[in-house]
């Protein structure tokens, strides 16, 4: 419960950092008038910081749900176990996306994009497990919906990691989704 509270409090700090980074980027744009790769970096950084802020929001939402789940789901619960594994995958995607962005590593970014299929697969598998659970015992609907919310947030975290990875191509080439931007 304390860890969950810490995550929720941390979201406020993430929001503050987002504003600070955006302010710094705008200051650079206005004062330095960057061109080419510098402009691409600043533009991509502003996009990435938005994704990171949203990931923080999702983490805070998960942290608010998890303490309740601990009271209604049993240890070894298959849906919870699979959700934990899904969370590990989404977390690794985020770490790898941030590393790929920092290193401007297109191959690493591509690996992040490819990894999203596994997170999406887990989401759909767990969703089906929960639907079957509710069909078998409608009294479990509230606990199942809490797990469903958690896995949806995890799936969105994976999507934001993909967004971050997609900005690597832009950093290197000025292309985003294979379209020349500048």
Locate the predicted segments by residue.
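Cytosolic, long alpha-helical scaffolding segments
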Residues: 1-182
């Amino acid at each position: 419960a304390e860890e969950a509270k810490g995550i929720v409090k941390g979201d406020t700090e993430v929001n503050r950092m987002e504003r600070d980074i955006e302010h710094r980027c705008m200051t650079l744009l206005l004062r330095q008038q960057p061109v080419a790769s510098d402009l691409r970096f600043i533009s991509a950084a502003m996009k990435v910081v938005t994704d990171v802020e949203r990931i923080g929001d999702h983490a805070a939402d998960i942290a608010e749900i998890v303490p309740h789940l601990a009271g209604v789901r049993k240890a070894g619960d298959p849906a919870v176990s699979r959700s934990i594994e899904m969370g590990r995958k989404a977390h690794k995607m985020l770490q790898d996306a941030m590393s790929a962005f920092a290193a401007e590593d297109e191959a690493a970014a591509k690996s992040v994009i490819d990894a999203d299929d596994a997170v999406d697969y887990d989401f759909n598998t767990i969703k089906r497990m929960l639907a079957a659970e509710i069909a078998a015992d409608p009294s479990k609907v509230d606990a199942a919906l809490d797990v469903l919310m958690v896995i949806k947030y995890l799936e969105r975290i994976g999507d934001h990691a993909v967004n971050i990875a997609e900005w690597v191509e832009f950093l290197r080439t000025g292309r985003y989704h294979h379209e020349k931007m500048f």
